[in-house]
Amino acid sequence: MANYTAADIKALRERTGAGMMDVKKALDEADGDAEKAIEIIRVKGLKGATKREGRSAAEGLVAATVENGVGVMIELNCETDFVAKADKFIALGDVVLRAAVASGATDVDGLLASDYEGRTLGDYVTEEGALLGEKVAVRRLARVEGAFVDAYLHKTSKDLPAQVGVLLAVDADSADAKTAAHDIAVHTAAYSPTYLTREDVPAETVENERRIADETARAEGKPEQALPKIVEGRLTGFFKEIVLVDQPFAKDPKQTVGKVASDAGTNVTGFARFRVGN
């Protein structure tokens, strides 16, 4: 006769995030001892971790916070949206984010090597992934600093945690600047710019786009004397797609993002944008 109850199974599932059959097997093996059962679940889960390493983890969440003028954002991945919306996975995202803030890490390797309750954060994430039964990985980390930093998180589904996150810094902290920063952060989430300014775009990327614009215009039979103006016009269109400050502002497309910032007495000085799986 089993030395545990249905309530014990429910409690252990809530503590570990493991499936019902895995919990029952662990309790059977542990003769009803909950702590021993947790250890069994961890061991069996970790044994399967190497098998999970090669699996794709393209679901998950983005978490972000701002403290003392420093914005920190992480992307935590798992394999399925079922785990992505689990309370235990969401709590793990908060642990990783808090560890990123506390450690001051600037990249994922440094974050995973940081200490967390007597072991590395990387080991803790692996252990939690074992309990969840999926490959769980910290994919990205961003830190953005400025006079004011806005953090914006966007849910693409009401059933899932945030899938898109933005950190956006400006060089002023007035009320107008803060409002503009938030509006531009929301814009950034929707329009996914790649670079802050034209100067940030690699020269080879610009030259390649210039060459394509020139060759395309020639193939269209445009007159030779009109080519320079046509090429520059197409380059401007290219910059409007990928450069944040050159993009038409979402709330008022007649203005650029850069103009919105300057009208608020500030400038955008940095940003980071994550979308789960991208």
Curated annotation (Swiss-Prot):
Enumerate the PROSITE patterns for this protein: EF_TS_1 (PS01126), EF_TS_2 (PS01127)
Query: Which keywords belong to this entry?
Result: Cytoplasm, Elongation factor, Protein biosynthesis
Q: Which SUPFAM superfamilies match?
A: Elongation factor Ts (EF-Ts), dimerisation domain, UBA-like
In Swiss-Prot or TrEMBL terms, this protein is called Elongation factor Ts
Pfam families reported for this sequence: EF_TS
Q: Where is this region: Involved in Mg(2+) ion dislocation from EF-Tu?
A: 80-83
Give the protein family.
Answer: Belongs to the EF-Ts family.
Entry-linked InterPro entries = EF-Ts_dimer_sf, Transl_elong_EFTs/EF1B, Transl_elong_EFTs/EF1B_dimer, Transl_elong_Ts_CS, UBA-like_sf
Q: What does this protein do?
A: Associates with the EF-Tu.GDP complex and induces the exchange of GDP to GTP. It remains bound to the aminoacyl-tRNA.EF-Tu.GTP complex up to the GTP hydrolysis stage on the ribosome.
